[in-house]
From Swiss-Prot:
GO CC annotations on file: cytoplasm
Keywords: Cytoplasm, Magnesium, Metal-binding, Pantothenate biosynthesis, Transferase
Class in the EC hierarchy, top level: transferase
Assigned EC number: 2.1.2.11
Pathway it works in: Cofactor biosynthesis; (R)-pantothenate biosynthesis; (R)-pantoate from 3-methyl-2-oxobutanoate: step 1/2
One Gene Ontology term of the molecular function aspect: 3-methyl-2-oxobutanoate hydroxymethyltransferase activity
Protein name: 3-methyl-2-oxobutanoate hydroxymethyltransferase
InterPro entries the UniProt entry points to: Pantoate_hydroxy_MeTrfase, Pyrv/PenolPyrv_kinase-like_dom, Pyrv_kinase-like_dom_sf
Main localization, broad class: cytoplasm
Length: 275
């Protein structure tokens, strides 16, 4: 049975943790979905891990719709959330509702995610009014990387911490069904999670959130050159892939692959007529 926004709320209400991961294509979505995950975020992080951009700012709506379609086709259980990219909702409330609608109508997503606190409250209200579920996102919001001066922990001083608490309450009031808390101190995320009735989903926000999300390439160690402090390795897929590719190259070079069992047969009398 498909997880829904109601499932997320039910899990919080009974004290059961919510599990989420990112996915960007059909194959990985199918694997993650079959593992029993509650939700999949088609994150604009695809700009960095799939498209090779330095940050998420270059990702377009067309990129997001394309990848979200693929993920939806690979799932039957997880709630699929489409990440609204930079400048798809900041320009006007009309654009916010229109682009959120594209995720639902064209891509088949079940909800959308917006970054920001009080500044996007009106956009969230309008999207929810259009019957589209919205996941909020506060703390380190990657689309604001230039304002933050880099990817830095947020909420370490009293002023910013109080603003994050207030932002969470505003997002709940605006109609968000859950909120991602990214890169904020663990004790602050505990206060926020206890201050609102909707679920919090942490990424680098400690154990007190109602759920957790990670980028699957990070938690499966697909890239060895970058590993955020908050990521635990749950597998070493990157090394396995490199080992497999290296072995493939070796066997092709040495004519060990393909073997007879990998080849298709033809009768010798047919072959003889071809010479």
């Amino acid at each position: 049975m498909r997880n829904t926004v109601s499932t997320f709320q039910e899990l919080k209400d009974r004290g059961e943790k919510i599990t989420m991961l990112t996915a960007y294509d059909y194959s990985m979505a199918k694997l993650i979905d079959s593992s029993g995950i509650n939700g999949i975020l088609v994150g604009d992080s695809l700009g960095m891990v799939c498209l090779g951009y330095e940050n998420t700012l270059s990702v377009t709506m067309e990129d997001m719709i394309h990848h979200t379609k693929a993920v939806v086709r690979g799932t039957s259980n997880a709630l699929v959330v489409g990440d609204m990219p930079f400048m798809s909702y900041q320009t006007s409330i009309y654009d916010a509702v229109y682009n959120a609608g594209r995720f639902i109508k064209e891509a088949g997503a079940h909800a959308v995610k917006l970054e920001g606190g009080a500044t996007v409250a009106e956009e969230i209200k309008a999207i929810v009014k259009a019957q589209i579920p919205v996941m909020g996102h506060i703390g380190l919001t990657p689309q604001s990387v230039n304002m933050f001066g880099g990817f830095k922990v947020q909420g370490k001083n009293e002023k910013v911490a109080k603003k994050l608490i207030e932002d969470a309450k505003i997002l709940e009031e605006a109609g968000a069904f859950s909120i991602v808390l990214e890169c904020i101190p663990e004790k602050l995320s505990k206060i926020i999670s206890e201050s609102i009735s909707i679920p919090t989903i942490g990424i680098g926000a400690g154990k007190y959130c109602d759920g957790q999300i990670l980028v699957y390439q990070d938690m499966l160690s697909m890239f060895s050159d970058f590993k955020p402090k908050f990521v635990k390795s749950f597998g070493n897929i990157g090394e396995s892939i490199k080992d497999g590719v290296s072995q493939y190259i070796k066997e092709v070079k040495e004519s060990k692959f393909p073997e007879e069992k990998h080849a298709f047969k033809i009768d010798d009398d047919v072959i003889n007529k071809l010479y």
